[in-house]
Amino acid sequence: MALWGGRFSQESSALFKLFNDSLPVDFRLIEQDIVGSIAWASAITQVGILTEQECKDLHHALNELLAETIDNPQLIIASGAEDIHSFVEQSLIAKVGDLGKKLHTGRSRNDQVATDLKLWCKKEGEQLLGLLANLRAALIELAERELDAVMPGYTHLQRAQPVVFGHWCLAYVEMFERDISRLQDALKRADTCPLGTGALAGTAYPMDRVKLAKSLGFASPTLNSLDTVSDRDHVIEICSDASISMMHLSRMAEDLIFFNSGEAGFIDLDDEVTSGSSLMPQKKNPDALELIRGKTGRVYGSLMGILTTMKALPLAYNKDMQEDKEGLFDVMDSWSICLEMAALVLSGLKVNREKTLSAAKQGYANSTELADYLVAKGMPFREAHHVVGEAVVSAIAKQTPLEDLTLEELQAFSAVIDADVYDCLTIESCLAKREALGGTSLPQVKSALAVKQAS
């Protein structure tokens, strides 16, 4: 039976019920709905709606229902209830009779679902923070394991300057630390309790909403009933945070897919995160990484979906807002599995150091060092840049690295070049000079790694 049937003289059509019911999606809120109902029973007891014994009976029945359903979603879905709130109330009435009909006194499904959703976001958000921390730890472990492996750094997907692999790992540590900070901030803003604000104008009962909020683990109650039941900022913000984090995951996946390609051959991926081809027996495909990259799109889609749903809604609750959950649940599921999979990929990754070093020595990645050498000799940088560009053109024509040009050939571009030029053109010199804070010199990377390991 629907919770709102008294106003209507005929049953809803089967098509409308199928269209309107949200239980196949919001059954996931069972724990939060029951926990919120337990708190509400205590709150209405304190204002005289229930006796202490009635409150105890409701608490017992609600806890019993939670034990029956927490690991049995099919039991919930098979009930045919309109939504998770209807399921809980109908199940409660079946257990305690008319006493169950008292529980909804002073409460609306509007503040109820807002409370459920915030409780769910808080719980799942904490789990996501743990997964982000695990991925951060996996990157730090990989950075330590492959710290000094020399590889080319890229701009425009062209070899630019040499870096060490540990520096690459720590770049992504920075990104995922920002993701952690963003999610922490979002959860802090979500830590206000909607319960007790009613349908839109507040409850008619003199609730201690501060006490109610604390009983549910919130920092404080919300302060405006109209805003409270209209608000889905926490859903949007978490989906936004997930989208940014998935972008970071996708970029990391793209790097690793390229590093693993036959054209690069910089890394080997473990068999447990790759698959083969049904036709080509030689193939070992980076499917885990490609799926991370692919799932990023569906997370973006969910963010755009909730933004579009909310963009023109008048205050307060509108049924459009029922569409907030499916996308949110999918975002959190996708984000979670991608974080877990990324950590697994990193745990078995091996760097082919000979190939990365060989690649770092190609592509004239030491050109900037030659320009800096000329600057040290007193030449203005812009002029040095031009001179080195001419030297690179000459080296390309001769199909030789810069460091293999003779001194006479180099001096043809500038008379200030001397025999000491070759010292600055080595890979070791290129790396060692990047010693300012944040650079890729080995001492700097070791120092940065130590900071991350200690925090």
From Swiss-Prot:
Record's catalysed reaction(s): 2-(N(omega)-L-arginino)succinate = fumarate + L-arginine
GO molecular function, one term: argininosuccinate lyase activity
GO cellular component, one term: cytosol
Major localization class: cytoplasm
Protein name (record): Argininosuccinate lyase
Keywords assigned: Amino-acid biosynthesis, Arginine biosynthesis, Cytoplasm, Lyase
Disulfide bonds: none
Entry EC no(s): 4.3.2.1
Stated family: Belongs to the lyase 1 family. Argininosuccinate lyase subfamily.
Pathway linked to the protein: Amino-acid biosynthesis; L-arginine biosynthesis; L-arginine from L-ornithine and carbamoyl phosphate: step 3/3
Subcellular location: Cytoplasm
One GO-annotated biological process of the protein: arginine biosynthetic process via ornithine
Pfam families, per database record: ASL_C2, Lyase_1
SUPFAM superfamilies referenced in this protein's UniProt entry, alphabetically: L-aspartase-like
Organism: Shewanella halifaxensis (strain HAW-EB4)
Group of enzyme by EC: lyase
